[in-house]
Amino acid sequence: MLTLPDLLLPPELAEINALMDAAEYDDGRASARGIAAGVKSNRQISRRWPKVARLDEILEAALRRCRPFREVLSPSAYTPALFARYFPGDAYGPHVDAVMGGNPPIRQDISMTVFLAPPETYQGGELCLHHQASPTQTIKLPAGHAFAYPTNCVHEVLPIQSGERRVAVVWIQSFFRDPDIREMVADLRRCVESAKSTPNTDPLPISKVLNNLERKFIGT
């Protein structure tokens, strides 16, 4: 799991929200499958709406410049975002996201929620992750922050009591399907950068380990 503070700059966040004010929306259940469709209640921007391309451009630019996104998650591909609004009474009950998504389809290893509304402007709407061996984790971040978590985790969005929850959701295929390998690669990348900035330290040995680990396990 990874928190990305200030993924979106204030001007980007303002433009996204202005576009969302004017957008065309579909019933959110149209993008859900199986059990998820029966527990989902929200509105999502239609991919047929012409200006959705501008929303994609803004988020794409933010992801491209975000170093932790690249170095920790090792994305090989990711889906276009779903931009969603939740009003009072809306929720998304416990579910697991689909294995494949996007067009063309990609394997969905990591789910990422980008928060677009200040948390003080709505009550409820927390993202809850249900872990088998640890307590439920509740996430409600400032606008512009993002949170990435394993797609195979049971999670839900609690009912909105007042105000409006706005989010963008992206699904990511990682070069490293195994989350343990992905974490080791990210740790070694940090070690290499630390060695580069430490006087009288040779980064080559650990860089060699990193390169060989990537070579052995990298995939799509």
Range-by-range predicted roles:
Residues 67-186:
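Catalytic core of non-heme Fe(II) oxygenases with the double-stranded beta-helix
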Residues 1-75, 181-220:
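Non-heme Fe(II)/2-oxoglutarate
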